[in-house]
């Protein structure tokens, strides 16, 4: 279905009824990159609306607004074939009924436009923020699908949505590329056959940045110099080439974590942008918090959602506690504990149902480590310096290559202080007691009265936060997330969205 006026849009919206509504905003000249966005929206269920609007506000006077590709009939056919329910192609008066003179414009966060395209395209991101705010107001979607190719624009809109508390979920889609690596773009149509071959040098030069990093070059200046030389030697006119952090887009002097190597070049009459996410290892997500905050369940689901390995560090401490109890040892330093740790073998096996299997010296202790007896003693065992040292070393060895999500009480402060994202997941004592009771009941275990559970949880909080070795603390750079009133799925969605601001989908997608 093709919609043109605001009245057409409102009739279509009213006829749809409740349910998810996915908006894929475009400026037209659709290609397979747009089709991927539409297909991703289709897979999530609900209705899918594609908007086509060449926004005059985001073009500077000397840019290509007048000749920007316009082919509405082809766009309509591609959108429907990819799974859209309707395509809306409004006129400027539908989006901006008061005209430019009567328009209230929105400005992006200044830090997000201080680099990359911001300085060379004055007014561009103000135009983007303004038009997207109008589209969201008119459509009121539940989901907004955006490509990671325009990473700076994506970060600007994420901040806009968060700061203005708009009830819409942003869904990123990895950059799609041609066989030679050039990102799919409507502006590729400006390139002649010869220029098209020349443009392929852009992704090739950016890929050299990762090769230099792999060879040990972490300093920005020599890395940028080498990449720029490749571009200019190939005849590309470099508008900018910068190395910035992913969430705030601030310039970096060296690569210490995931970094964005981004460029804009001119090839003939076309201005092309591209980027490469540089990583020295796969990312780590650290989730800390007090007992009963739902860390294990959340971390397991987050790891699955992100395609990362789940490292249940809490289960490791429970495994040591269970083994001490099995042998009749007190939770204290001494030769018995040293001997136990010397022979300790903890191995995670395939998930059994929804829970990861833990083998302690070859014995399946998955259920045994979740009993009330183990829960009551695990904090004291975890406070023992030798236990802490032994398990921290094991965990750090597991994390040398990255690619994992770990949960515990000191993951972000002691085990993985260089984790790309740190979450401090918490909940009130009353909420955690209620969850603990439900968990015990689900396992057919005895359920104490809530007041007893609340006291036990408060006591454990005190022990965890006051112990001398690796006390429970929120890392200074951690994001606090209070989970009261939120479902597991809602908590997972928030954490995944935060992670995607630090690590793009395409950085973990071998096909991107």
From Swiss-Prot:
SUPFAM superfamilies: Nucleotidylyl transferase, P-loop containing nucleoside triphosphate hydrolases. It holds the Pfam family Pantoate_ligase. The keyword Metal-binding does not apply. It catalyses: (R)-pantoate + beta-alanine + ATP = (R)-pantothenate + AMP + diphosphate + H(+); CMP + ATP = CDP + ADP; dCMP + ATP = dCDP + ADP. NCBIfam families: cmk (TIGR00017), cyt_tran_rel (TIGR00125), panC (TIGR00018), PRK13477.1 (NF010004). GO terms for molecular function: ATP binding; CMP kinase activity; dCMP kinase activity; pantoate-beta-alanine ligase activity. (R)-pantoate binds at residues 58, 153. Residues 1-276 are annotated as: Pantoate--beta-alanine ligase. The lineage of its organism: Bacteria, Bacillati, Cyanobacteriota, Cyanophyceae, Synechococcales. This is Bifunctional pantoate ligase/cytidylate kinase. Catalyzes the condensation of pantoate with beta-alanine in an ATP-dependent reaction via a pantoyl-adenylate intermediate. Its EC number is 6.3.2.1, 2.7.4.25. Keywords: ATP-binding, Cytoplasm, Kinase, Ligase, Multifunctional enzyme, Nucleotide-binding, Pantothenate biosynthesis, Transferase. In the N-terminal section; belongs to the pantothenate synthetase family. In the C-terminal section; belongs to the cytidylate kinase family. Type 1 subfamily. It comes from Synechococcus sp. (strain RCC307). Pathway: Cofactor biosynthesis; (R)-pantothenate biosynthesis; (R)-pantothenate from (R)-pantoate and beta-alanine: step 1/1. Beta-alanine binds at residue 58. GO terms for cellular component: cytosol. ATP binds at residues 27-34, 147-150, 176, 184-187. InterPro entries: Cyt_trans-like, Cytidylate_kin, Cytidylate_kinase_dom, P-loop_NTPase, Pantoate_ligase, Pantoate_ligase/cytidylate_kin, Pantoate_ligase_C, Rossmann-like_a/b/a_fold. One of its GO terms (biological process) is pyrimidine nucleotide metabolic process.
